[in-house]
Amino acid sequence: MATPDVSVHMEEVVVVTTPDTAVDGSGVEGVKTVLVTTNLAPHGGDLTEDNMETENAAAAAAAAFTASSQLKEAVLVKMAEEGENLEAEIVYPITCGDSRANLIWRKFVCPGINVKCVQYDEHVISPKEFVHLAGKSTLKDWKRAIRMNGIMLRKIMDSGELDFYQHDKVCSNTCRSTKIDLSGARVSLSSPTSAEYIPLTPAAADVNGSPATITIETCEDPGDWTAAIGDDTFTFWRGLKDAGLLDEVIQEFHQELVETMRGLQQRVQDPPLQLRDAVLLNNIVQNFGMLDLVKKVLASHKCQMDRSREQYARDLAALEQQCDEHRRRAKELKHKSQHLSNVLMTLTPVSLPPPVKRPRLARATSGPAAMASQVLTQSAQLALGPGVPVPQLTSVPLGKVVSTLPSTVLGKGSLQAPPASSPASPLLGGYTVLASSGSTYPSTVEIHPDASSLTVLSTAAVQDGSTVFKVVSPLQLLTLPGLGPTLQNVAQASPGSSTIVTVPAGAAPGPEEHTATIEVAAMAEDHERK
C-alpha cells in the first residue's frame, strides 16, 4: 500500500520588527518577534525578496497579518541583537503526545538527540529529554516521537524539507540515511538567504505561496517496509526484476555486506573501537531493525553473569561455613589442650626439700605398726624407729640384721667402737639384735661397750663367729644356739634353734631395774649374701 502524498501549503515568511526588550536585567541582547503565517490560500499584497528591507518589515508583516482572514498558525521567531547586527532565529512548533514545545533550528545541529535545542516551558532541553517528559520514552526513535504539524520529524528530515543546522559543515556521521529519493524533491530549509528574510518554501514553489507537492518515502521498522514505499519505488524494483538484474544486485549487496562485516569483525578485535566502525554498526542496527538482537545478546550475557554470580555466592557461602567449622574445631582443640596441660601440671610431683631432722631423745614406740610401716618402705634394708619393746620383735622376721647403727656405717664392714663417754654413740642405751646361728650373716656387727651400764659377757661362747650377744645391765640379750628351751619369757623362736630372749632384772647382776627396749635402726635382706 503506497503512502499518500503529503501536501504542505506554505506562505512567505515575514519578519516583524518590534522594539528591543531586554532578556534580563543586564540588557545584553534584545529580543524581537517574528510572525510566520501559514495559510491555505494566498492573500493580497504579495511580498518579494527583492523589495523586502529592514525598515518596512514591520509594516509589511502587520499588513499581511491583518489582511489574512484564513490564518491557521503563527510561528514565533526570535531575533538576537548584538550591536548593530541582526540574526534571525527560526523556531518550529513541535509536539510529542500532548506536550508542545518549540524547536530552535539554529541550535538543532547534528546528531540532535542530545543537543539542547528544544524550548519547553521557558527551558531549553534536548529532544531526548523532551520525549521522556512527554511520556514517549518507550519509542525506539525520537524522530518518530516528535511531530511537526502532525507529521513525524523523521519523514520531514528524510524528505529533505528540514535538515540540521549547517549540516554540510557540522556532521557527526551518525545521521546518514540509506533511503532512496526517486522523486527528486529533496529540499533543504537550512540555507537562509539573509539575516532578515528566511524562506520556508520549497525550491519548486513560487514566491507567492503556491502549493507544492512533496513525496516523503521513509521506513522505520522491517515490518513497515512493504507498506511504506511509494508506487515509483515499487515500479523501480519490479523493473529490475523484469530485466533479470535483481539477482545480480542482490548478489552484489550480499558480497558487499559480507566484506563489510568481515572487515568490521577484524577491526573490532584490536581496541579501541574506531568511530567509523561505530557509525557502521549504528546504521546497520537502525536500518535493518537489529536492535532486538543486540538486546537479546545483552540479556543472554546478563543472565549468564547472574548465574555465575549466584554460583560464586554459593561457593563463597560454603567456604565461609567450612572456615567457621574449622575455627570452631580449632577452638575446641585449644580448649582441650589447655585442659590437659592443667591436668598434667596438677599430676606432676613437686620436689620438696627433705625436712631437717633434729636429734631427739630415745622414746619407746609401742605396737608393731611402726615396725611394719618401716618394713614396707624398703625391701633390702628396713629402718625402724627406736624404743621398740623386746616382746614386739615377734613381727621382725628372722634371718635379718637389726642394729641401731646407720645403714651407711653397716655397709662399711667392721665397726669401730666410739669412746664410752661419747654422747652421740648410737649404741647408748640401746641393743643390737643379730641373726641366729642358722643365719648367713656371721660376725656382721661387733659388740662394743659404750656406757658404764653396758656389760659384755665372756666371748668364749661365741668363738665360732656365728654367735653375738650384748649385755646391758640389768638386762641381757642373748642369741646363743640351743638356749631356747632353757630361757624364760620366750619372745620368738626360729626354726634354726635361735631365740631372742629377754631376761628379767632379777636374773642378771645389777641393782637397777629397767624396761627392756630395743632400738632397731636398719635391716639387711637375707638373699643379698647368697
Swiss-Prot record:
Domain SAND: 81-163
Coiled coil: 304-348
Tissues in which the UniProt entry reports expression: Expressed in peripheral blood lymphocytes and fetal liver. Expressed preferentially in reproductive and/or developmentally important cells, such as testis, placenta, bone marrow and fetal tissues.
Glycyl lysine isopeptide (Lys-Gly) (interchain with G-Cter in SUMO1) cross-link, chain position(s): 155
Annotated GO MF terms: DNA-binding transcription factor activity, RNA polymerase II-specific; identical protein binding; metal ion binding; RNA polymerase II cis-regulatory region sequence-specific DNA binding; sequence-specific double-stranded DNA binding
Entry GO terms, CC: chromatin; cytosol; nucleoplasm; nucleus
Any Gene Ontology biological process: transcription by RNA polymerase II
Binding site for DNA: 136, 140, 143, 154
Compartments in which it is found: Nucleus; Cytoplasm
Modified residues (Phosphoserine): 373
Record-linked InterPro entries: SAND-like_dom_sf, SAND_dom
Covalent cross-link Glycyl lysine isopeptide (Lys-Gly) (interchain with G-Cter in SUMO2), where: 155
Major localisation: nucleus
Keyword tags: Coiled coil, Cytoplasm, DNA-binding, Isopeptide bond, Metal-binding, Nucleus, Phosphoprotein, Transcription, Transcription regulation, Ubl conjugation, Zinc
Entries under Pfam families matching the protein: SAND (PF01342)
Binding-site positions, Zn(2+): 110, 167, 171, 175
Function noted in UniProt: Trans-acting factor that binds to glucocorticoid modulatory elements (GME) present in the TAT (tyrosine aminotransferase) promoter and increases sensitivity to low concentrations of glucocorticoids. Also binds to the transferrin receptor promoter. Essential auxiliary factor for the replication of parvoviruses.
Subunit details: Homodimer, and heterodimer of GMEB1 and GMEB2. GMEB1 and GMEB2 form the parvovirus initiator complex (PIF). Interacts with the glucocorticoid receptor (NR3C1). May interact with CREB-binding protein (CBP).
PANTHER family given in the database record: GLUCOCORTICOID MODULATORY ELEMENT-BINDING PROTEIN (PTHR10417), GLUCOCORTICOID MODULATORY ELEMENT-BINDING PROTEIN 2 (PTHR10417:SF2)
Record's protein name: Glucocorticoid modulatory element-binding protein 2
Annotated source species: Homo sapiens (Human)
